[in-house]
From Swiss-Prot:
Cellular component annotations (GO), alphabetically ordered: nuclear speck; nucleoplasm; nucleus; spliceosomal complex
Signal peptide limits: none
Descriptive protein name: WW domain-containing adapter protein with coiled-coil
Annotated gene: WAC
Species per Swiss-Prot/TrEMBL record: Homo sapiens (Human)
Composition bias, Polar residues: 23-37, 211-225, 317-331, 428-463, 489-503
Biased segments, Basic and acidic residues type: 38-50, 60-69, 182-191, 226-239
Linked pathology: DeSanto-Shinawi syndrome: An autosomal dominant syndrome characterized by developmental delay, hypotonia, behavioral problems, eye abnormalities, constipation, feeding difficulties, seizures and sleep problems. Patients exhibit dysmorphic features, including broad/prominent forehead, synophrys and/or bushy eyebrows, depressed nasal bridge and bulbous nasal tip. Additional variable features are posteriorly rotated ears, hirsutism, deep-set eyes, thin upper lip, inverted nipples, hearing loss and branchial cleft anomalies.
Function, in words: Acts as a linker between gene transcription and histone H2B monoubiquitination at 'Lys-120' (H2BK120ub1). Interacts with the RNA polymerase II transcriptional machinery via its WW domain and with RNF20-RNF40 via its coiled coil region, thereby linking and regulating H2BK120ub1 and gene transcription. Regulates the cell-cycle checkpoint activation in response to DNA damage. Positive regulator of amino acid starvation-induced autophagy. Also acts as a negative regulator of basal autophagy.
């Protein structure tokens, strides 16, 4: 190949010229895409790159007499060591100009990182070079990569064994590097706490810190944050913030339940991988599910105490980002559906911060994870049942008792039907208190309400819990749950719903409103209706909406007297899955048959059209032939006349 041009130089000086000379020539000839340097410049961080002179690799490529050593000149040992050192820092392979600049910057960043420069010569003298350094990577004329060994002059297609071993070593070294920065660890935690509201993105934050973290390349930063979020960052940060509560506003990765009451500060043990990325919202400002400063009103603290009694149980279930239910009594009922929601954290007093869950993108990202958790943890509890419990819990008394039942039993062990019947009894007793029965479901019954717990700016003590249940338009409650309308319908099983609805109606007088409610529970896909419920967060007029949406099933009092659900029970509540599957299959088959039939007709039409076109072409050809023959007849006639005249 091209190797013969440099062969004489290489013979005289075995090791050095082969290194300093032949490969730069080769790299000039083909801009070699050498061994990917992302691993290399991570690897350099492990070596103490304390070389006082910057690695001028571009010089070695030039033809200056100091660097292009000829055969006759001897080499001073210092130069030899220097090129060895530069070579070793490169990882021996990156010679293309793009990677030169890449390595150059990485080396400069790691230069300040060294403990003492005297380590380096000893290292190079211990291991003069790696056997993997002899290999370099090139592109053949056909465009494939091949690997060339400059010592044995062997070229091969597959990646050499030495390179694979070295990559393995570098990976192990990187793992050690990632876990061996205690100073950086503490510093990053403090920086992230201090700049929680100043809008740094996490990468920028770590880059600007003046400690050793500034020396890490970006990809290692992302790795450390990913590794260490699980290992140390969360527990440490929590203990830190609990010991000095007023010092920092709030840390971007910790999601505290806003409980000023006595909640045990047990750290998170599990946390999803994608959560650190989401901890910055559109402004990069602060945490994802930041909750309001809790009201110090008495009812709120009651519910908090109940939460803290059962707070230890859900910790074992928590798999995803715990978007905790706000403790100010806004929707405490959304704590039981998410078993991840009640994870207790150290009580952190929070400065009043505007709600940040209004970003629909974040909600859209969070929703699948939370739904998956709900299905994992509460596989035995249907979402529709939780809905019905929330729908039935109308008044303050029934709400309090049901929350207490939920929280004492724990999310795995509640008996839904008994709860519903009790709630229905309570609601019939408290029915004269003129509260709209559907108003509670405006925010709590929607199965998505735990994705966006309605976030309020801090409320004064004067707001009791009862108005929050009937949700009058309190001025300080922004509507946050509106972006959720885009989500699809949540699966409900239509089988168990009518039974629970019947239990309700066994205890209640049969009124159009209760029928409405049961019909809303029976509707198999509560897509738009439920979301319209949840979107009217600050609205007390939910019942008129529902009546307009489901006006089909309202009975006049005269008819209601003659109406008995027992007579139609046998046609209610059949499992619709089978019928739905059949219907969808038949619809698809009909659609396919129709498309096949239409395509056949289309091909026939095209065929006929082409036949017509062929006929037209043939007709024009015949016309042309007729015209041509007529022309020839005329000419022959003329010639005949001339001949007869000549004769």
């Amino acid at each position: 190949m091209v190797m013969y041009a440099r062969k004489q130089q290489r013979l005289s000086d075995g090791c050095h010229d082969r290194r300093g000379d032949s490969q730069p020539y080769q790299a000039l000839k083909y801009s070699s895409k050498s061994h990917p340097s992302s691993g290399d410049h991570r690897h350099e961080k492990m070596r103490d790159a304390g070389d006082p002179s910057p690695p001028n690799k571009m010089l070695r490529r030039s033809d200056s007499p100091e660097n292009k050593y000829s055969d006759s000149t001897g080499h001073s040992k210092a130069k030899n060591v220097h090129t060895h050192r530069v070579r070793e820092r490169d990882g021996g392979t990156s010679y293309s100009p793009q990677e030169n600049s890449h390595n150059h910057s990485a080396l400069h960043s790691s230069n300040s990182h060294s403990s003492n420069p005297s380590n380096n010569p000893s290292k190079t003298s211990d291991a003069p070079y790696d056997s993997a350094d002899d290999w370099s990577e090139h592109i053949s004329s056909s465009g494939k990569k091949y690997y060339y060994n400059c010592r044995t002059e062997v070229s091969q297609w597959e990646k050499p064994k030495e390179w694979l071993e070295r990559e393995q070593r570098q990976k192990e070294a990187n793992k050690m590097a990632v876990n061996s920065f205690p100073k950086d660890r503490d510093y990053r935690r403090e920086v992230m706490q201090a700049t929680a509201t100043s809008g740094f993105a996490s990468g920028m934050e770590d880059k600007h810190s003046s400690d050793a973290s500034s020396l890490l390349p970006q990809n290692i930063l992302s790795q450390t944050s990913r590794h260490n979020d699980r290992d140390y960052r969360l527990p440490r940060a929590e203990t830190h913030s609990s010991s000095t509560p007023v010092q920092h506003p709030i840390k971007p990765v910790v999601h505290p339940t806003a409980t000023p009451s006595t909640v045990p500060s047990s750290p998170f043990t599990l946390q999803s991988d994608h959560q650190p990325k989401k901890s910055f919202d559109a402004n990069g400002a602060s945490t994802l599910s930041k909750l309001p400063t809790p009201t110090s009103s008495v009812p709120a603290q009651k519910t908090e105490r109940k939460e803290s009694t059962s707070g230890d149980k859900p910790v074992s279930h928590s798999c995803t980002t715990p978007s905790t239910s706000s403790a100010s009594g806004l929707n405490p009922t959304s704590a039981p559906p998410t078993s991840a929601s009640a994870v207790p954290v150290s009580p952190v007093p929070q400065s009043p911060i505007p709600p940040l869950l209004q970003d629909p993108n974040l909600l859209r990202q969070l929703l699948p994870a939370l739904q998956a958790t709900l299905q994992l943890n509460n596989s035995n509890v249907d979402i529709s049942k939780i809905n019905e419990v929330l729908t039935a819990a109308v008044t303050q008394a029934s709400l309090q008792s049901i929350i207490h039942k939920f929280l004492t039993a724990g999310p795995s062990a509640f008996n839904i039907t008994s709860l519903i019947s009790q709630a229905a009894q309570l609601s019939t007793q408290a029915q004269p208190s003129n509260q709209s029965p559907m108003s509670l479901t405006s925010d709590a019954s929607s199965p998505r309400s735990y994705v966006s717990p309605r976030i309020s700016t801090p409320q004064t003590n004067t707001v009791p819990i009862k108005p929050l249940i009937s949700t009058p338009p309190v001025s300080s409650q922004p509507k946050v749950s509106t972006p959720v309308v885009k989500q699809g319908p949540v699966s409900q099983s239509a089988t168990q719903q009518p039974v629970t609805a019947d239990k309700q109606q066994g205890h209640e007088p049969v009124s159009p409103r209760s029928l409405q409610r049961s019909s809303s529970q029976r509707s198999p896909s509560p897509g738009p209706n439920h979301t319209s419920n949840s979107s009217n967060a600050s609205n007390a007029t939910v019942v008129p909406q529902n009546s307009s949406a489901r006006s089909t099933c309202s009975l006049t009092p005269a008819l209601a007297a003659h109406f008995s659900e027992n007579l139609i029970k046998h046609v209610q509540g059949w499992p619709a899955d089978h019928a739905e599957k059949q219907a969808s299959r038949l619809r698809e088959e009909a659609h396919n048959m129709g498309t096949i039939h239409m395509s056949e007709i289309c091909t026939e039409l095209k065929n006929l059209r082409s036949l017509v076109r062929v006929c037209e072409i043939q007709a024009t050809l015949r016309e042309q032939r007729i015209l041509f023959l007529r022309q020839q007849i005329k000419e022959l006639e003329k010639l005949k006349n001339q001949n007869s005249f000549m004769v």
